[in-house]
From Swiss-Prot:
InterPro entries: ALO_C, FAD-bd_PCMH, FAD-bd_PCMH-like_sf, FAD-bd_PCMH_sub1, FAD-bd_PCMH_sub2, FAD_lactone_oxidase-like, Oxid_FAD_bind_N, Oxy_OxRdtase_FAD_BS. This is D-arabinono-1,4-lactone oxidase. It comes from Eremothecium gossypii (strain ATCC 10895 / CBS 109.51 / FGSC 9923 / NRRL Y-1056) (Yeast). The lineage of its organism: Eukaryota, Fungi, Dikarya, Ascomycota, Saccharomycotina. Pathway: Cofactor biosynthesis; D-erythroascorbate biosynthesis; dehydro-D-arabinono-1,4-lactone from D-arabinose: step 2/2. NCBIfam families: FAD_lactone_ox.
Length: 532
């Protein structure tokens, strides 16, 4: 018999230890649930409300943040992972696929590929769940595509009352806007409909370019392809520029990768361990060696190597090792100033042996501006650039600049685009590497450029910007988040207030405020709400 009415006992575990992919934190929830149906999710939420318990929903655990840490109830939807329906456009321009929200993105890839469809745009990995990938603002890198959530047609949510709520642009649009980037604080997404397109391959060019080449060509480089990203190696003063367009050409063998081999990977991680634990000053030399092994030494701008890959292989990437990650978004037009400032700071820090950075520093863009209305062109082809929108609503907690204005694809310039800069510090063989000095400087630089942090990453903040109880500086671990409540309230303003209003309406008993400290110190809830 189940220990919880309406939920099979096989879907409940005690003494479960949840660890995130990076191994930065773990949690021991009181109960760990893996429901198999929407009815079971409803039963869990209602029981939590009645018993005064709180719930965190987890998926693949790929967020390096501790936002999901809890010692109360934890729900994982890996067993709620079926495909429910595929509705195809009569003209074959797109299809709407409805899935249970626990399905992983890579599982959805397999289903869609077998039927000749693909997701329109992807982030760097496909391990996340369909419900989780939108909950923190996942994005790819393109001057035409925005947040992954813009592909979603509708959602079904189990809110804090234990009610099933259907959401789309016409039904509860305010709740839909909150749920498309909810941080798990509204309820549990149990079902989603996603707009997909006919499967396509990507013809990409990968070039080694000098750092100054990137800056000199900043005005045109970001709108030169539908998909584009750049990896910056400051100690080599070079970048790797990857650009891709849709194609009907057949896929070929993927590019060779030195660190993709067993030996190359082991050598790289071992050298990183040496720089972290024995001799930090070796870091620039190690990074130069690694760059030469992977990419060579010669600039190939305008003459890069080409490849044709499936959209999945082209857009996903190898994230290498366990890592701390701090990513911020700011207007793309501020990019040259930001990169020059970071470049100077990194060089000065290395010269003074103050701190050393790991590479690459990932530089990406997105177009999160939205038209007032959209109709898919009658003559849209498989290789046509740009999105087929699932909805035209901006999530309240979207961290990209809100003042940017939409332009048709033919008129897109840097003025429509958001710049994402991603600072990564590896944890070789699980070793915690110091990050505080580098990430603090990084955050100060991006904040001054109109930036805001990615919700799911390792942003630190400071005791001056946190809310709730704070400790003295020497009581914090180097990598521990301090909080950014005052800044977040300033940045998001009325959008945050509207999100909080929706959250209170959908979860009046605070069932989904499990990690209270994280939510308070980052301004998602006010501390007095916990006493109400």
């Amino acid at each position: 018999m189940s220990v919880l009415a309406g939920v099979e006992a096989s879907g409940i575990a005690r003494n479960y230890v949840f660890k995130n992919w990076a191994g930065i934190y773990s949690a021991r929830p009181r109960l760990y649930f893996q429901p198999r149906s929407e009815d079971e999710v409803v039963a869990i939420v209602r029981a939590a409300r009645e018993q005064g318990r709180t719930i965190v929903t987890v998926g693949s655990g790929h967020s390096p943040s501790d936002m999901c840490a809890t010692d109360d109830w934890m729900v994982n939807l890996d067993r709620l992972n079926g495909v429910l329906e595929l509705q195809e456009d009569e003209q074959g321009r797109y299809a709407d696929v409805t899935v249970a929200a626990g399905i992983r993105v890579y599982e959805l890839h397999r289903y869609l590929s077998a039927r000749g469809y693909a997701l329109q745009n992807l982030g760097s990995i496909s391990e996340q769940s369909v419900g989780g990938i939108i909950s923190t603002g996942t994005h790819g890198s393109s001057p035409y595509h925005g947040l992954v959530s813009s592909q979603y047609v509708n959602l079904t949510l189990v809110n804090g009352r234990g009610e099933l709520v259907f959401l789309d642009s016409e039904h509860e649009p305010e709740v839909f806007r909150a749920a498309m980037l909810s941080l798990g604080k509204l309820g549990i997404i149990v079902r989603a409909t996603i707009r997909v397109v006919p499967a396509f391959n990507i013809h990409s060019t990968q070039e080694v370019i000098n750092f100054e080449t990137l800056l000199d060509n900043w005005e045109t480089i970001w709108t030169s392809s539908e998909f584009i990203r750049c990896w910056w190696y400051p100690y080599v003063r070079k970048c790797v520029l990857w650009r891709g367009v849709k194609t009907s050409e057949p896929a070929e063998k993927s590019r060779s990768s030195w660190w993709g081999t067993t030996l190359g990977r082991l050598v790289y991680e071992s050298l990183l361990w040496l720089t972290v634990n024995v001799y930090p000053s070796l870091t620039p030399f190690v990074e130069r060696f690694i760059f030469r092994q992977q990419y060579g030494k010669v600039e190939t701008f305008g003459n890069g190597d080409e490849a044709v890959q499936t959209s999945i292989d082209g857009l996903n990437m190898d994230c290498l090792f366990s890592q701390f990650v701090d990513e911020w978004a700011c207007p793309l037009n501020n990019g040259p100033e930001v990169l020059r400032s970071l470049d100077h700071s990194i060089a000065q820090a290395a010269q003074n042996k103050e701190f050393f950075v790991h590479v690459p520093i990932e530089v990406r863009c997105s177009n999160t501006t939205l038209p007032h209305e959209y109709k898919c062109p009658e003559d849209r082809t498989v290789t046509a650039p740009g999105p087929v929108y699932g909805n035209l609503l901006r999530p309240y907690l979207d961290n990209t600049p809100s003042h940017l204005r939409y332009a048709p694809l033919s008129d897109v310039t840097n003025s429509q685009l958001t710049l994402y800069i991603n600072a990564t510090i590896y944890r070789p063989f699980g070793t915690n590497t110091p990050i505080h000095k580098w990430f603090t400087l990084f955050e100060d630089t991006l904040g001054a450029a109109g930036g805001k942090p990615h919700w799911a990453k390792n942003f630190l903040g400071s005791t001056a910007t946190a809310a709730g109880p704070v400790k003295s500086s020497d009581e914090y671990q180097d990598y521990e988040m301090r909080g950014m409540a005052t800044k977040i309230k300033e940045w998001y303003g009325d959008n945050l207030k509207q999100f909080q209003k929706v959250r209170r309406e959908q979860d009046p008993h605070n069932v989904f405020i499990a990690n209270k400290d994280w939510a308070v110190k980052n301004g998602i809830i006010d501390i007095d709400e916990l006493d109400s």
